[in-house]
């Protein structure tokens, strides 16, 4: 009896000391056996391969070997042509998200998954990823600015159609073009303001580091030194050692 008690107690102690790592259980209806799934950390350049596996019965599993100090911004890539040696001829699907030290579920129809490459229609909404609180926060941000983002895209496409494309043939619809640009700038300002407010409220999250880097890159020289300093000094000390913080600082220094 004492031996049994010791074995059970030892097992419980070992379980308690197991590192908390990410685990992704994936379901890709329509995927063929042999498709390769890879998970990359894209916090910084170059990307770092975290894990890889092969799809079997439309399912896959990825699991970490050590605990993330901070949630990682990742890209999950599905290689539908693993035997193709020419990278230019490969068919790749990809999805970017934040991974926590948690059990996550990834679901998407294979033919509806976003492409690794640019495509005119954003398909990220076809993916369901649950179990990552950090990704939930990022999704909450995207939902909060969805209307502004869609309006910004629509205005840019209208500008290309009304002014840019005709200008290539020597037709300059200047008045119409300037009207669109003024409205586009107003929408961009509102979007930047909403992003800035989100960063202030969530200044302890790596999500805000990603958004800050995007904000700095999109505004370029439009931000004043005081605004940049205010942005950089607004993060909690807990984020100072995050790899994404290094990228944000480099971007700010180039402004």
Language model: regions and residue ranges:
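N-proximal helix/coil linker or "cap" segments that precede and/or mark the start of modular domains
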Residues: 227-255
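Amphipathic alpha-helical repeat scaffolds of TPR domains
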Residues: 157, 174, 204-218
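Helix-turn-helix repeat elements of alpha-solenoid scaffolds
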Residues: 183-192, 222-229
């Amino acid at each position: 009896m004492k031996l049994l008690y010791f074995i059970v107690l030892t097992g419980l102690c070992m379980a308690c000391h197991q590192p908390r790592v990410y685990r992704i259980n994936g379901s890709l209806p329509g995927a063929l056996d042999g498709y390769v799934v890879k998970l990359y950390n894209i916090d910084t350049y170059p990307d770092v391969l975290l894990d890889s596996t092969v799809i079997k019965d439309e399912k896959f599993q990825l699991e970490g070997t050590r605990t993330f100090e901070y949630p990682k911004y990742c890209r999950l890539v599905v290689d539908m042509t693993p035997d193709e040696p020419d990278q230019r001829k490969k068919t790749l699907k990809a999805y970017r998200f934040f991974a926590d030290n948690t059990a996550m579920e990834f679901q998407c129809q294979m033919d509806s998954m976003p492409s690794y490459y640019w495509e005119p229609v954003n398909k990220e909404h076809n993916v369901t990823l649950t179990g990552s609180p950090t990704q939930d926060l990022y999704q909450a941000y995207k939902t909060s600015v969805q209307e502004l983002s869609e309006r910004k895209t629509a205005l840019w496409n209208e500008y290309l159609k009304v002014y840019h494309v005709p200008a290539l043939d020597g037709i300059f619809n200047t008045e119409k073009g300037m009207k669109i640009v003024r409205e586009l700038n107003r929408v961009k300002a509102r979007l930047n303001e909403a992003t800035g407010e989100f960063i202030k409220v969530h200044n302890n999250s790596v999500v805000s580091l990603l958004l800050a880097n995007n904000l700095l890159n999109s505004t370029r020289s439009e931000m004043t030194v005081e605004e940049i300093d205010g942005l950089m000094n607004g993060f909690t000390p807990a984020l100072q050692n995050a790899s994404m913080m290094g990228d944000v600082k480099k971007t700010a220094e180039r402004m």
